[in-house]
């Protein structure tokens, strides 16, 4: 069997996804005590893993460095990479939301300023609504931007809402549901069809039982 390389998102999503691969019989023990390592081999299969930042997973898959990737739907919507989206894994579930301070009135007729890590998604969303907004991209914690008067509102991922609450913000509108997706390199799906679909079919069986 040909080797298959899988790119995983480091951090929170990684913890949700590794158990799925273990359930289909892959040995992921190397990743349990990984230290600073970013590449791993499954000892009982033809699969190897790499751990990268969320924004890089789809890039590695698009360019064929990884055959399969696991990444949030938010990243796929923002960067629109040329890959196949195969499965909604139904883990890492959260929502992309518009949030601001309680006193903010979104119905005020003026151009709004929105801070976000997702300028492309945000631009398309407000364009579809016919609203003219100024978008300011912020890479760090966007929650502080409305408090300092930089923007009127933010667009960000909300899981429990605790971070918003701790910073005095509320959800104004839920935009999109977000969850982890399995993506595949287009060329790899042809060259390693049997190996990749073997993984996909097993994962689908696990997900369908949830």
Curated annotation (Swiss-Prot):
Question: Which Pfam family is an annotated match for this chain, by its short name?
Answer: HisG
GO MF, one annotated term: ATP phosphoribosyltransferase activity
Q: Name one GO cellular component term.
A: cytoplasm
Kindly give the InterPro entries that the UniProt entry links to this protein.
Answer: ATP_PRibTrfase_cat, ATP_PRibTrfase_HisG, ATP_PRibTrfase_HisG_short
**Which controlled-vocabulary keywords does the entry list?**
Amino-acid biosynthesis, ATP-binding, Cytoplasm, Glycosyltransferase, Histidine biosynthesis, Nucleotide-binding, Transferase
Question: Which one GO biological process term can you cite for this protein?
Answer: L-histidine biosynthetic process
Q: In the Enzyme Commission scheme, what number(s) does this protein have?
A: 2.4.2.17
Give the record's pathway. Amino-acid biosynthesis; L-histidine biosynthesis; L-histidine from 5-phospho-alpha-D-ribose 1-diphosphate: step 1/9
State the reactions this protein catalyses: 1-(5-phospho-beta-D-ribosyl)-ATP + diphosphate = 5-phospho-alpha-D-ribose 1-diphosphate + ATP
| Disulfide feature | none
Tell where it localizes: Cytoplasm
Grouped into one coarse class, the protein's main location is: cytoplasm
Q: How does it assemble?
A: Heteromultimer composed of HisG and HisZ subunits.
What HAMAP family does this protein map onto?
A: HisG_Short
Function (record text)? Catalyzes the condensation of ATP and 5-phosphoribose 1-diphosphate to form N'-(5'-phosphoribosyl)-ATP (PR-ATP). Has a crucial role in the pathway because the rate of histidine biosynthesis seems to be controlled primarily by regulation of HisG enzymatic activity.
* Family to which this protein belongs: Belongs to the ATP phosphoribosyltransferase family. Short subfamily.
Free-text comment about domains: Lacks the C-terminal regulatory region which is replaced by HisZ.
**Protein name (record):** ATP phosphoribosyltransferase
Task: Supply the source organism for this entry.
Answer: Bacillus cytotoxicus (strain DSM 22905 / CIP 110041 / 391-98 / NVH 391-98)
């Amino acid at each position: 069997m040909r080797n298959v390389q899988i790119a995983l998102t480091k951090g929170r999503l990684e913890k949700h996804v590794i158990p799925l691969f273990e359930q289909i019989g892959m040995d992921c023990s190397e990743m349990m005590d990984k230290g600073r390592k970013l590449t791993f081999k499954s000892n009982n299969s033809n699969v190897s893993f790499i751990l990268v930042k969320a924004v890089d997973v789809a890039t590695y898959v698009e360019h064929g460095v990884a055959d399969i990737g696991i990444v949030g739907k938010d990243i796929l919507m923002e960067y629109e990479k040329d890959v196949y989206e195969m499965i909604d894994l139904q883990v890492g579930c959260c929502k992309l939301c518009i949030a601001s301070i309680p006193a903010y009135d979104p119905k005020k007729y003026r151009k709004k300023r929105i801070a976000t890590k997702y300028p492309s998604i945000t631009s398309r969303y407000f364009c579809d609504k016919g609203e003219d907004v100024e978008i300011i991209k912020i890479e760090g914690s966007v929650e502080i931007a409305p408090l300092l008067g930089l923007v009127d509102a933010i667009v960000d991922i909300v899981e429990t809402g605790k971070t918003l609450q701790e910073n005095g913000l509320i959800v104004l509108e839920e935009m999109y549901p977000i969850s982890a997706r399995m993506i595949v390199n287009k060329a790899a799906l042809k060259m390693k069809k049997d190996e990749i679909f073997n993984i996909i079919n097993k994962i689908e069986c696990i997900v369908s039982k949830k």
